[in-house]
Amino acid sequence: MKVNTTRFGTLDVPEDQVITLMDGLLGFGESTRFTLIADEVGEPFKWMQCLDQPSLAFVVIDPAPVLSEYHFSVKKEQIKAIETDQVDDLQVYVVVTMAADILDVTVNLQGPIVVNKKNRLGVQLVLSDPKYNTRHALFTNQPENEVEFTEAIKQENRVASMRVAIAG
């Protein structure tokens, strides 16, 4: 499938790379088909590019590697539409709100996107747990939690060191 996007130009997306969100995303119910694109910054960031509305794309991450305390329960009826009741079949993503200052980057922990890895069907859940919100700080500046890591900066083929803390 060829899609002419506003952000990435023309994409040739194989059918096995299409994620179908059964009810779309909140506020974008008509947009149900997406694909994941690696971000130039690198992991853990990815772009969730809409195939139905080429100007629509969101930055997402798998929260597991960076937010180890993020756990929630799913009722079988919540994921019935994606045709699984096996936790191992599920991949979770959360939407990222990027900012100029890395300490202002947030993630929506209240609305995770849950995808069945086997058939690429997904749903966006709305969690009612008060400990999760739509603007959870992804990074903090608390020294006791600092983690040093390197990111390849593809534009210049060099490596930069970034010192951040994983919110915990």
Predicted regions and their residues:
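Extended catalytic/binding region for NAD+/ADP-ribose chemistry, centered on the ART fold
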Residues: 69-74
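Long, compositionally biased stretches
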Residues: 1-67, 87-93, 97-167
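Short active-site loop/helix that positions an aromatic residue
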Residues: 76-86
